[in-house]
Amino acid sequence: MKERMENAYTETMFLLKKYNITANKSLGQNFLIDDDVINKTVASAEITNEDLVIEIGPGLGTLTSRLLEKAKKVIAIELDKKMIKILQERFSLYSNFELINE
């Protein structure tokens, strides 16, 4: 199952509009929209299919989708209830995805 679009900007704008979401500044939210930044982040982490990745504040899951392609398991910790719904809808079919929302 391929969940992401052709680029992070398009994906982010689509999800923000679809779910009527704006950044919650009190939670320090911002959204990754630059594919180069995402790709460099994932590459510099040197993630393999043996790795467990813990992602704090996955937001819309733009980085999460890249991590799921590389890691054995991704545990995402999210506090925002609106984001939890989106993450569940996007990644519930991934066997290597776990969402913690406490």
Task: Describe each model-derived feature in a short phrase.
Residues 1-102:
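Catalytic cores of RNA-modifying enzymes
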